[in-house]
Amino acid sequence: MDTIKINPEFDGQFCKTTSLLDPEEFRRNGHMMVDFLADYFHNIEKYPVRSQVEPGYLERLLPDSAPIQPEPIEKILKDVRSDIFPGLTHWQSPNFFAYFPCSSSTAGILGEMLSAGLNVVGFSWIASPAATELESIVMDWLGKLINLPKTYLFSGGGGGVMQGTTCEVMLCTIVAARDKMLEKFGRENIDKLVVYASDQTHFSFQKAVKISGIKPENFRAIPTTKATEFSLNPESLRRAIQEDKKAGLIPLFLCTSIGTTSTTAVDPLKPLCEIAEEYGIWVHVDAAYAGSACICPEFQHFLDGVEHANSFSFNAHKWLFTTLDCCCLWLKDPSSLTKALSTNPEVLRNDATDSEQVVDYKDWQITLSRRFRSLKLWLVLKSYGVANLRNFIRSHIEMAKHFEELVAMDERFEIMAPRNFSLVCFRVSLLALEKKFNFVDETQVNEFNAKLLESIISSGNVYMTHTVVEGVYMIRFAVGAPLTDYPHIDMAWNVVRNHATMMLNA
């Protein structure tokens, strides 16, 4: 029989013992962590917004193996500041205007801390009843807040669940729609299923379609144009469906968007849903970013027609000041989802589940284990109240309007898409570049604006990103970081203007 071999690295070494969950150690280290983060937020503007490091930088700084002996929290936090901070892009910086916001808040962070400290695994009601029931209650609260029809709420026969990301939500709803359709046509016809979206729909939808087993060639990305403000044209959808029907295919699923990633275009829900209903197509409404704005009554008209859809989602972690991750999904018929995803092995059997009087959220998602996400959103709603949350969002939209006005007043620039929420899309215009450099085509204009954006980002002062729509390169300026105020908007515009002036005068 082989003997146990002792690693000489450990043989004879004295190892310090430490408690894994000592209350006093937690209190001391927790205070230090809170102070560390508070100092970070206080000094966040001192850091370049986008990380300036090169790939592989961290491997050169850290040892090639884990420490044998424990290290004090003071040293660990020192290492965070010296080694980790240079590799951070600071999403909470007031000068972060890239992508869409991933906005945080004191309540959101403390809610995350509370959830992590309790560390319950709420896959079923019995596993932690409060986790399940608070999630159901908060989902109804939030649904009422954005004025979702009662049919989406638990109180009206529907229901909501918190998942990680939009991609997870899309996958779950596609699978629910797929299984429901194949019950009618037979599983052997899965290769005939077709899904529809606009060419502006978030790219995660295509990933979800691929994972769900739908053939890649049966994904219809219907082109949009500036004439419809890059929203999905209902007649274009109808033509695509009719062509597929003639080819013997089975229309399955339509993903609509309220606030597309590139330009925050809004698809016309009502006519799209009416067409989908004619053909028995499941309609999902993705409002990942813009859904948060719908807590304000003046933006709820963008959801007109959602009563005709099957499911709706938005990300509270984007613009509702709740830390990543927290994607909220509502369904009018949750049984379609649970029928597709439910499992009930003997190890999870219990009287509450067997009674069918409780929600088991394991059957509403891909994974079994799940976090206590509702706790942080509950804290956000309670700590700030609806009135303050609405005003935070309105202030971001007003700041975006201010930036848009600054751009419009400079004749060298042009606004490239309607500003529906807090995103402004702009560029240095073809006319300005034609006057200065005799540019005559969009390729040259695109190249100039790409160089302008990189110059702006390299300064470290602000961070913005770009998109390309109909072959046109445009710079995206998204307001939504929790610390942003008007001076940051003015500073960002000065950076844009000064870098443009420098390049135009070169």
UniProtKB/Swiss-Prot annotation:
Which prosthetic group or cofactor does it need?
pyridoxal 5'-phosphate
Q: Which InterPro entries match?
A: Aromatic_deC, PyrdxlP-dep_de-COase, PyrdxlP-dep_Trfase, PyrdxlP-dep_Trfase_major, PyrdxlP-dep_Trfase_small, Pyridoxal-P_BS
Instruction: State if Lyase is listed as a keyword.
Output: yes
Reactions catalysed: L-phenylalanine + O2 + H2O + H(+) = 2-phenylacetaldehyde + H2O2 + NH4(+) + CO2
Query: What keywords are assigned to this protein?
Result: Decarboxylase, Lyase, Pyridoxal phosphate
Tissue expression as described in the entry: Highly expressed in corolla limbs and at lower levels in corolla tubes and ovaries.
Q: Which family does it belong to?
A: Belongs to the group II decarboxylase family.
UniProt name for this protein: Phenylacetaldehyde synthase
